UniProtKB/Swiss-Prot annotation:
Its cofactor is Zn(2+). This is Large ribosomal subunit protein eL37. The lineage of its organism: Archaea, Methanobacteriati, Methanobacteriota, Methanomada group, Methanococci. Keywords: Metal-binding, Ribonucleoprotein, Ribosomal protein, RNA-binding, rRNA-binding, Zinc, Zinc-finger. Binds 1 zinc ion per subunit. It comes from Methanococcus maripaludis (strain C5 / ATCC BAA-1333). A zinc finger (C4-type) spans 20-38.
Length: 64
């Protein structure tokens, strides 16, 4: 077997993320046991931030 750059291409097998049980997205990190999308495994609350939605404008109509 050779070493060097040609061998590095053989390291792309397997996957770091699998389908999350809570949100259903392919964001659950296998080794960390944490979902990158919803925070499952780290927090009991769904991960969310204020910058995910546009700011409230006018009479309080939230625009997505």
């Amino acid at each position: 077997m050779t070493k060097g750059t040609p061998s590095q291409g053989k390291h792309n097998k397997g996957s770091n993320h699998i389908v999350c049980r809570r949100c259903g997205r392919r964001s659950f990190h296998v080794r960390k046991k944490v979902c990158a999308a919803c925070g499952f495994g780290k927090s009991s609350k769904i991960k969310r931030f204020a910058w995910q939605w546009k700011k409230v404008t006018g009479k309080g109509n939230r625009v997505k």
